[in-house]
């Protein structure tokens, strides 16, 4: 299936790229960040070539759906770690059930269509900044507990040709502004 990407419109009706949408959102909410552009890096392996040695924890972001397809989860963790989906399912279930919420059930990667519908993104550009597009707050964000210890984090600005570096405290401010539910859990 082919997608027709429709550029975002900002308040003054000018066309903005996905990256500009993220950067403008952060500026409008007075959230400090640094940004740099580089050649396309759709995978961690590709992007590593272009990342600067800025001291940030570069994050891997995976988008899942439950077996019924009615719940969606974005999972973020340090890109230097790997996760088996079965282990991830167990940890997410444990976290949800401990809060009295229904289990996530069996997880699978969300399709590109679902990614576009809920985050406005394509594979290779997923990041927590996609939550800007989730105006109904459908997606729940799981962050690895170890990210709390990072002084700064880095993510794609919804475009795999750039990197945004943001302090952990300012990332927390972003999450409160965007309004989706989120929690920290131990993933590894």
Model-found features: residue ranges?
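Extended, low-hydrophobicity, polar/charged segments
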Residues: 3-188
């Amino acid at each position: 299936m082919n997608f027709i990407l429709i550029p975002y419109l900002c308040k003054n009706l000018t066309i903005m790229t996905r990256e500009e949408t993220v950067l403008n959102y952060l500026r409008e909410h007075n959230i400090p960040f640094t940004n740099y552009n580089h050649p396309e890096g759709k995978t961690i392996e590709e992007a590593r070539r272009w990342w600067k040695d800025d001291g940030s924890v570069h994050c891997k972001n995976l988008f899942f759906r439950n077996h019924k397809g009615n719940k969606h989860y974005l999972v973020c963790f340090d890109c230097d770690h790997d996760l088996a989906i079965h282990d991830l399912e167990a940890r997410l279930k444990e976290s949800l059930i401990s809060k009295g919420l229904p289990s996530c059930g069996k997880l699978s990667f969300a399709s590109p269509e679902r990614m576009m519908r809920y985050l406005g993104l394509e594979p290779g550009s997923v990041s927590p900044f996609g939550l800007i597009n989730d105006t109904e707050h459908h997606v729940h964000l799981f962050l690895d507990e170890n990210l709390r210890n990072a002084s700064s984090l880095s993510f794609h600005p919804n475009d795999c040709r750039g990197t945004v570096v943001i302090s952990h405290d300012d990332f927390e401010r972003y999450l409160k502004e965007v309004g989706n539910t989120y929690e920290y859990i131990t993933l590894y």
